């Protein structure tokens, strides 16, 4: 953001007086962020140049508790083109901003509503980043969220593995520990091996991200971030599922956290780019048809 935006936004954020939601996904457009119904056209009001926004957003997590929404809208160009999308910081109390249906999910309840924009006006100063280059702002956001998700999923996966090992050593059906059975050992060996390899890749990628500018990350590390993300999110689902199996009935119950871990982390295989999108990103770098 600009120096003026930093002065306006950062202090109240640090004081807990301001929060932002992320408005990229639309009801008719999920993974393909370059197609969107939301548009913004130039309009001057009371001598102040700005933009009039119309459209819709979905999965705007955090509403109604946040004060602003990072709203991505097409300002020029054709659908399917990355160029021509702009990010606007829109106050949630702006006339024409309407919170609609709240979406219940597998794990997280009701703070994911639809939003409708009807002639919502914002000044030019509400543009975050460069005009027509809003997807670069979105990329910065999702790269950081993807590596965060990967670390979170790895930690939860390791917990599930550790608890399954502990229980398998303690539980003694038919007079001997579950742990002596290779049907228990081998799946946990594979899960632990994957966890160890992922840990190194996540640490390496996160350290490299810290040493680069955000544009450099997008250019040089995007594929590594995607590798971390989709593999870790798959791992935690597999680890939680097997931990349930090792624990039997009590593992499936809410007296153990495995079902909650599964429900919570299963969404990570869809949010911040579905795992198929992550794999497509890796393939693009691998085969040289995507930067």
Model-identified regions with their sequence ranges:
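A short, Trp-centered hydrophobic/proline-enriched beta-strand micro-motif
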Residues: 16-24
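Long, acidic (Asp/Glu-rich), low-complexity accessory segments flanking structured domains
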Residues: 119-137
